[in-house]
């Protein structure tokens, strides 16, 4: 989808300073970012769906409004219909990506993965992968179903008991967790 096209735009600006002002309207041109230290070695697009299992073929449902960009595995925007327009994407786990990309440490993981965030975080932490920061949007909380909220609360406690602190919660349902032993003043 559009994320791939946007990444291509960004790569054309690697090594460049920002030349435009940030608009805060949602879509930003690559020229608003300071990309002087960014290159293909430190910002790579991995064309797989992050998941808690490897090598699955998962349906990602198109948003009902074409201007919207986020595809979703839950299809909550179309009453969970299985017949909506979709694409098929192969999955990878964080473990697989870490191994393939030879990653030793994760400073920040940002997850806006439209319905897969809960099992992905469980698997990541159970596998003892502890990023310094976890920024996550819990999209399923938007549907206000009790079972979704309960799953979130269980995960929230799981994250806390794994040594994280909730550091920011200013735009529901976006959360920032920070690993306590990595930062001295929290």
Q: What spans do the regions from the language model cover?
A:
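Phosphate/nucleotide-binding beta-alpha loop and adjacent structural elements of enzyme active sites
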Residues: 1-186
